[in-house]
A protein has these predicted regions:
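Short beta-strand/loop element within the Bergerat-fold HATPase_c
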Residues: 59-71
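A conserved beta-strand-to-alpha-helix junction within the catalytic ATP-binding
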Residues: 1-12, 63
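Short alpha-helical Gxxx[C/S/T] motif in the catalytic ATP-binding
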Residues: 111, 115
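Glycine-rich ATP-binding loops of the HATPase_c
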Residues: 123-129
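Short conserved segment of the HATPase_c
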Residues: 84-96, 138
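Short helix-loop "hinge" at the ATP-lid/N-box region of the Bergerat-fold HATPase_c
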Residues: 51-52
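Glycine-rich G1-box
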Residues: 16, 82-83
């Protein structure tokens, strides 16, 4: 599965949100991986969509890259959004877990749980680093 084609599809699916928020989504040259294209599209769509949803007053900037780590590819999805405190980083992958009220940020609280399930189904791992007020970086692996 060509990762760049997948990201373009995810961006097309999010084209209204990207246009309305004036988000900038960029990516480096990305690998071809053995993965279900529909699930990989959903994974990127959820991560990019969250970056747009949880942006600061300025427009969202999202950058996607990948590095070969020998037996796996590590994908990095980095944004300049509102970020979150470190105490919440593990909880966000739990289904229906929300850090904000629906009034502040719409959503169901299942997107990142779906991301985790997709990555695990492909034999990978997903984790996050974040700094409140600076942004969030999601990492996930897909075996080579």
């Amino acid at each position: 599965t060509d990762s760049e084609t997948i990201i373009r599809q995810a961006m097309e699916n999010l084209n209204v949100a990207i246009a309305e928020s004036q988000a900038m989504v960029t990516y480096d040259a990305l690998p071809t991986v053995i993965a279900d294209p529909t699930q990989l599209t959903q994974l990127f769509q959820n991560l990019i969509g969250n970056a747009i949803k949880f942006r600061r007053e300025t427009s969202a900037n999202v950058h996607i890259s990948a590095q070969n780590q020998g037996n796996e590819w590590t994908f990095v999805v980095q944004d300049n959004g509102i970020g979150m405190e470190s105490e919440y980083l593990e909880r966000i992958f739990t289904i229906f877990q929300r850090l904000h009220s629906r009034r502040d940020y719409p959503g169901t609280g299942i997107g990142l749980a779906i991301c985790k399930k997709i990555v695990e189904r492909h034999g990978g791992r997903i984790w996050v680093n974040s700094e409140l007020g600076i942004g969030t970086t999601f990492y996930f692996t897909i075996p080579v």
